[in-house]
Amino acid sequence: MPPMTIKDGEYTATVYKMIKEGRYGDAIHILSKEHQKHTKSRAALSLLGYCYYHMQDFTNAAECYEQLTQLHPEVEDYKLYYAQSLYGACAFPEAMKSTFLLDNTTSHTKMIKLQAAIKYGEEDYSGAKTLVEQLPQEDPDYDVDLGCLLYKEGEFEEACKKFMSSMNVLGYQPDLAYNIALCYYSLKQYASALKYIAEIIERGIREHPELSIGMTTEGIDVRSVGNTLILHETALIEAFNLKAAIEYQLKNYAAAQEALTDMPPRSEEELDPVTLHNQALMNMDTKPTEGFEKLAFLLQQNPFPPVTFGNLLLLYCKYEYFDLAADVLAENAHLTYKFLTPYLYEFLDAMITCQTAPEEAFRKFDENAGKLTEQLRKVTKQVQEARHNRDDESLKKYVQDYDEVLEKYIPVLMAQAKIYWNRENYSMVEKIFHKSLEFCNEHDTWKLNVAHVLFMQDNKYKEAIGFYEPIVKKHYENILNVSAIVLANLCVSYIMTSQNEEAEELMRKIEKEEEQISYDDPDKKIFHLCIVNLVIGTLYCAKGNYDFGISRVIKSLEPYNKKLGTDTWFYAKRCFLSLLENMAKHMIMLRDSVVQECIQFLEHCELYGKDVLAIIEQPLEEDRMHIGKNTVTYESRLIKALFYEVTGWNE
């Protein structure tokens, strides 16, 4: 931006015009130069402090007001603004100390409110409550403050009533609407929460078109709106983050990501900790390296979202970075007791132990599972009693309690089973699942994993169908919402139990849905039917029928521009490498026409695979593959060279 030239005598008018238009950054640019010339200028410092405060830059605002309190100790307002700026900058001890300088009776109520807010920020809720109770009950903030304290005590319904009561008195306020939505979210009443969120967003769009809501999602390139006081007062950032959290909980992952891109645009360095955390979490599948960097960065900030610590550790375990998880736990022992529940700590401890002492880990998981089983039995009894007494309110609460305990039990059970799964001891995995039958038989994750373990045992395809079928039928009208590997395993199970018609019908259904999507979006790659055919081809190759199996694999990747991807190449190359191994051992002979077909296939992969990654590298991998080697083109050339060598065609 070129330097602005302002005529003498127009400085004040220009600066005030900028402030009126909300151009605080431009005003700061001019005022900073003025302050450098006149370091004790009351006007420059006062306006700078005001602009910094409105841009939510509380640290710089506090510096301005600190100087003003020293230059003009008689002005009570500067002392108040200094304390408020320190509070905004999360410098709670300094903010509390500065409130004691407020000695004017007119600012006494403001001082009490600020001290209560500081105690609340320090998580001293009893101290905050003592101060709030000193406020007159007719004060509009009294119920709001009590609502916040009730929320922290887990009294979500009572907190909600306080916020609603305040809204009736004060009229509509976005921050109160957000507080009500947050209470409903905590009560798992997502529809009610979304209703209040929708109103915040609709009002934001209507009243503040300059905030560019939804523009980023639509692909429009817009400049950052910055962290202004206006943005803060709209509660839009909080509302979009809460909407993203709800959609994420409901497993509507695309909608969750859209909620984050719909919020008013800001540059990455302007993002608040909650948005940064949610971006990391919700883009983890596509940008895991960035996700880990953001979460690790947040741990160094003060404050950071309380769930950051646990989420970073869980994600390290998910991506099998157990050493990193152990290091983070060891280096942040002070955070362990504050941010991890006993359940989560024990779960993470067992996960990390798995790598060095699987038997010890199994024992830890078993102990944890035992505690949760006891809780499930206790809550089951409470559910039965509530049903018997026709106590609908208690029944609703106990069913919710049961679901919460079950959601803790399932990961423990799966982690326990994975120890034996990794050893390919599938019968033991089946026994572990059988033990949990009474609690988990209606849970989709449990049913899916039971299906997988039955499928892996070769002689239990019929039983596997019994678990796969309900999952597929549940989503039959939107069959592409089902994982491709589930559809593939069900088709294989049908084939292995001579139910070829059912397999063909399922494949026709998948093909029909894929054709519809291709019609609506011709450039979109869809791999479901391709993976089903690849798995069937792999099955025939595993049974030694390479002629048919390889032919099926080749046909499944046509057309290559739509079907060749990292996952599909993974399945295809396994079949070709298995074929080459058996040919090299002289265990099978291939007809020349089939060899020719294989060479042509690899040449097509070479042609279309230039921009397709051969493997997805681990996000925190230090020794990265050469970019030219991690392509389908490179690997298909290698396999083609092996074909020439094994068949002698290059001689």
UniProtKB/Swiss-Prot annotation:
GO terms for biological process: cilium assembly; determination of left/right symmetry; establishment of planar polarity; intraciliary transport; opsin transport; protein polyglutamylation. InterPro entries: TPR-like_helical_dom_sf, TPR_2, TPR_rpt, TT30. TPR repeats lie at residues 8-41, 42-75, 140-173, 175-207, 379-410, 411-443, 445-478, 530-563. Its main location: other. Keywords: Cell projection, Cilium, Cilium biogenesis/degradation, Coiled coil, Repeat, TPR repeat. Localizes to the cilia of many ciliated epithelial cell types including pronephric cells, olfactory placode, the brain ventricle and lateral line organs. GO terms for cellular component: axonemal microtubule; cilium; intraciliary transport particle B; motile cilium. Residues 494-521 form a coiled coil. The keyword Transmembrane does not apply. One of its GO terms (molecular function) is tubulin-glycine ligase activity. It is found in: Cell projection, Cilium. It comes from the Eukaryota. Plays a role in anterograde intraflagellar transport (IFT), the process by which cilia precursors are transported from the base of the cilium to the site of their incorporation at the tip. Required for polyglutamylation of axonemal tubulin, which is a prerequisite for correct assembly of cilia and for normal cilia beat amplitude. Does not seem to be required for neuronal microtubule polyglutamylation. Belongs to the TTC30/dfy-1/fleer family. This is Intraflagellar transport protein 70A. It comes from Danio rerio.
